[in-house]
């Protein structure tokens, strides 16, 4: 009997750590080869492949915002797949009715659970390479702006590891393969609910959700981004560690190492989560300066007779601005006035979020301060441009601002209304500048009602042209550009006179115009 029991006594001495690592390697291969893992990776990269094949890649990506987009797809696509696959792998013995066989193996249940927790880590490392390759490819584009935050990039594999650990924990809590997909669905619903609440101004929810979105609907220079990325990474990593320790505890792991690990990851999650709420006064002051007096934070470049001033992150966009501005100028005769200048503008501080609004007095004060600062910096009557570029409507809005400056010699004020022949001429100048501005003009016209609106969402600055006045300009785009351009040059002074009616523009161009509305229904022009 003693001879029979001796081998079992030796078996107990088999090093569990080595056995656990061997099992983790096998499970890592199974994890990577699982069909759901492959489908998740294909879904993750499919938008990149589509952009490459169709040529629709964003030519002006803001890199630090693109990383946040990757976090979102990494959370729901790669992370969701990891949750389900990790859960299925941890439940394999139960699903195959082989639970009893594990009782005769030398590796205890907590160590097997640790192997399942380690198995997704090589996959997470591969996710890191995928995300870095995507951001690297975008950074090579000539129009790339901003710079990626390494902590935000590192968050993507941590999110995958967090959800994979959640899948293992669910397998130890409920022995059913249905639970993981249901949990992922519930998580998606909860995440959407939290996102809506955060968009309404709940800063706590914005910081405590796995993916930390910005609270502004447009890009900021990287130095002004209010996202505590490193602290948020520590917070999510702490959550992942806490879930992993919970899975080990549920598997029967006890003792001082488990207790110490639980305390440490809890402290990391709590400390990093709380640290996210620390406000940075220097960042707030920089945002105020960027809003009211951006010249001190910008670099200016002279291209021909035009000065272009932009935040350092966005200087790569200057050639795009120049192409649109020169497209507008091509149809304009030489005019006198201050030297042309383009200056980037961003509403980095005080932007209304969470349902709040900005009063007209506040907007007037902010715009007055900005115009005075621009003039003090040597760029009077500057043409403003925002931090959104590359889409057709943004280029059309900038073309409208440039056309207004060339017609009037002054920068437009917020909510300017351009009427009469000026309005028709402005619309034509926008449409003929570049193919992108022509497409943007059509989109803006389709979305407008009562007046054609050129509004920059990043600054709330814009102008509107009443539909009756805009219609002749749109119709003139159907005529040969050279013929219309010659007429514009010959009658420039008349067409840019605020007293000239749109009927005169229509008569000169030979295009129709709608009958004048009754006087009580006419739009009152303010510019």
Regions found by a protein language model. Name each.
Residues 45-52, 129-134, 185-196, 266-276:
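Aromatic-anchored segments of alpha-helical transmembrane domains
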Residues 124-173, 345, 409-498, 503:
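Alpha-helical transmembrane segments and their short interhelical loops
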Residues 85-123:
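Helix-loop-helix units of permease transmembrane domains in multi-pass membrane transporters
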Residues 1-86, 93, 243-259, 267-282, ...:
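Hydrophobic alpha-helical transmembrane segments
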Residues 82, 162-166, 170, 238-250:
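Transmembrane alpha-helical segments
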Residues 188-251:
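Membrane-embedded alpha-helical segments of integral membrane proteins
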Residues 48-81, 88, 117-178:
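Secretory targeting signals
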Residues 38-39, 177-192:
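Pore- or pathway-lining transmembrane helices of multi-pass membrane proteins that form conduits
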């Amino acid at each position: 009997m003693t001879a029979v029991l001796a081998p079992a006594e030796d078996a107990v001495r088999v090093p569990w750590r080595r056995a656990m690592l061997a099992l983790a390697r096998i499970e890592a291969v199974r994890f990577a080869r699982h069909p759901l893992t492959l489908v998740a990776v294909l879904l993750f990269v499919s938008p990149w492949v589509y952009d490459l094949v169709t040529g629709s890649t964003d030519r002006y990506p803001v890199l630090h915002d693109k990383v946040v987009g990757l976090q979102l797809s990494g959370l729901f696509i790669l992370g969701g797949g990891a949750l389900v696959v990790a859960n299925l792998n941890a439940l394999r013995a139960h699903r195959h009715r082989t639970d009893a066989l594990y009782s005769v193996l030398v590796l205890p249940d907590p160590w097997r659970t640790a192997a399942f927790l380690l198995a997704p880590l090589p996959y997470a490392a591969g996710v890191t390479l995928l995300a870095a390759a995507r951001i690297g490819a975008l950074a090579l584009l000539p129009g790339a702006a901003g710079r990626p935050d390494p902590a935000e990039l590192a968050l993507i594999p941590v999110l995958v590891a967090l959800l994979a650990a959640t899948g293992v924990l669910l397998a130890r809590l409920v022995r059913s393969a249905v639970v993981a997909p249901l949990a992922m669905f519930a998580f998606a619903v909860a995440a959407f609910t939290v996102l809506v609440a955060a968009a309404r101004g709940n800063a706590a929810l914005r910081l405590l959700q796995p993916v930390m979105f910005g609270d502004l609907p447009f890009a900021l220079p990287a130095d002004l981004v209010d996202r505590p990325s490193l602290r948020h990474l520590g917070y999510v990593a702490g959550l992942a560690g806490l879930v992993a320790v919970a899975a080990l505890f549920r598997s029967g792991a006890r003792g001082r190492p488990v207790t110490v690990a639980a305390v440490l990851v809890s402290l990391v999650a709590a400390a990093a989560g709380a640290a996210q709420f620390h406000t940075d006064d220097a960042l707030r002051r920089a945002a105020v300066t960027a809003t009211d007096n951006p010249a001190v934070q910008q670099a200016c470049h002279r291209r021909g007779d035009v000065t272009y001033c932009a935040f350092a992150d966005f200087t790569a966009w200057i050639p795009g601005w120049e192409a649109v501005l020169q497209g507008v100028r091509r149809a304009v005769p030489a005019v006198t006035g201050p030297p042309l200048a383009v200056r980037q503008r961003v509403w980095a501080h005080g932007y209304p979020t969470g349902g709040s609004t900005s009063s007209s007095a506040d907007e007037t004060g902010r715009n007055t301060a900005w115009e005075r600062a621009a003039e003090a910096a040597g760029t009077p009557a500057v043409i403003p441009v925002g931090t959104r570029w590359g889409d057709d409507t943004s280029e059309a809005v900038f073309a409208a601002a440039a056309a207004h400056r060339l017609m009037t010699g002054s920068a437009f004020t917020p909510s300017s209304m351009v009427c009469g022949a000026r309005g028709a001429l402005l619309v034509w100048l926008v449409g003929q500048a570049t193919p992108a501005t022509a497409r943007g003009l059509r989109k803006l016209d389709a979305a407008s009602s009562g007046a054609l609106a050129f509004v920059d969402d990043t600054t709330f600055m814009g102008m509107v042209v009443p539909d009756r006045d805009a219609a002749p300009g749109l119709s003139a785009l159907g005529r040969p550009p050279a013929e219309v351009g010659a007429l514009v040059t010959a009658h420039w002074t008349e067409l840019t006179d605020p007293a000239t009616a749109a009927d005169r523009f229509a008569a000169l161009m030979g295009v129709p115009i709608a009958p004048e509305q009754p006087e009580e229904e006419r739009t009152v022009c303010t510019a």
